[in-house]
């Protein structure tokens, strides 16, 4: 059952000289549970930067060997399974499997542009047998596109994790799914960064509309329309909080993870003092 869904629309600015990396949040909305501190302990890691060009990828505090690593052959077996034509460009479909799960590794396939050897897309998952705390399954989707400036740029990134409080594969009562999807649109190069953006030292700033709480039309902000599944989630997340069974399950999970039980006036749990 869905318990929370959130959306953020933001403008990203990046420059090498001068070195600038800024995010300007235009709008944000959250539907579902109000106190998401318990979920944040797990889902916060879904915001990790997944760059397969790096030799190792930090996922949930664990370094996974990238399939595009310089030393990839030490960790993976590669198979050229197909050669296709994607948007008029020859593309190699390469499947890879881990040689061993003694170290954190992935499993899946990548599509490589034959002319530039750039990553066009990837569908990878945590290899079966890899042990990461709280994670039962992990899947990553990456799509890149060729821009007008002949540069490959991220188009879509999605990470989905199956979190669990037990190690049993069959456990459903103490498990939940978390998913994060990012879509990049309206990419521009060689465009001057506004002076007000350069003048702030904060990596993340709020736009004037976000600060004022101005009501926004999300349909105009989204680069794509919500799927039917996402629309259904929005309708369900608010109503489900009134279901007694849901309240009881959330209270139990919050107590197990947080170590204490909140009442109206006090929190009941272990006592400690410094």
Predicted regions and their residues:
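Surface-exposed extracellular loop regions of Gram-negative outer-membrane beta-barrel proteins
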Residues: 114, 118-123, 269-274
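Short, solvent-exposed aromatic-acidic interface loops
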Residues: 124-129, 158-166
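Outer-membrane beta-barrel proteins
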Residues: 127-137, 141-144
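Short, surface-exposed coil-to-beta transition loops
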Residues: 104-107, 136-141, 177
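Active-site and channel-lining beta-strand-loop segments
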Residues: 96-98, 108-114, 123-126
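Structured extracytoplasmic
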Residues: 1-93, 97-105, 161-269
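Short, hydrophobic/aromatic-rich segments at coil-to-beta transitions
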Residues: 87-95, 119-123, 151-156
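Extended lipid/amphipathic-ligand handling interfaces
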Residues: 108-110, 114, 139-149
């Amino acid at each position: 059952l869905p318990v929370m869904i959130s959306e953020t629309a933001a403008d990203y600015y990046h420059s090498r000289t001068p070195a600038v990396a800024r995010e300007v949040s235009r709008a944000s909305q959250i539907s579902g549970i109000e106190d998401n501190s318990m979920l944040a302990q797990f889902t916060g890691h879904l915001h990790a930067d997944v760059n397969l060009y790096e030799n190792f990828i930090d996922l949930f505090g664990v370094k996974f060997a990238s399939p595009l690593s310089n030393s990839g052959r030490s960790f993976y077996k590669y198979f050229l399974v197909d050669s296709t034509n994607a948007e008029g460009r020859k593309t190699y479909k390469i499947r890879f499997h881990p040689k061993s799960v003694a170290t954190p590794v992935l499993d899946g396939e990548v599509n490589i542009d034959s002319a530039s050897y750039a990553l066009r897309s990837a569908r990878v998952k945590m290899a079966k047998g890899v042990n990461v705390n709280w994670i039962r399954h992990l899947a990553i989707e990456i799509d890149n596109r060729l821009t007008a400036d002949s540069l490959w740029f991220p188009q879509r990134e999605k990470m989905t994790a199956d979190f669990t409080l037990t190690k049993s594969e069959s456990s459903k009562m103490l498990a939940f799914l978390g998913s994060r999807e990012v879509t990049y649109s309206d990419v521009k190069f060689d465009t001057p960064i506004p002076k007000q953006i350069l003048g702030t030292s904060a990596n993340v700033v709020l736009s004037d509309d976000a600060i004022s709480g101005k009501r926004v039309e999300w349909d105009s902000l989204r680069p794509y329309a919500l799927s039917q599944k996402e629309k259904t989630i929005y309708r369900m997340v608010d109503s489900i909080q009134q279901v007694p069974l849901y309240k009881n399950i959330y209270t139990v999970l919050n107590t197990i993870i947080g170590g204490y039980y909140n009442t109206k006036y006090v929190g009941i749990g272990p006592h400690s003092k410094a």
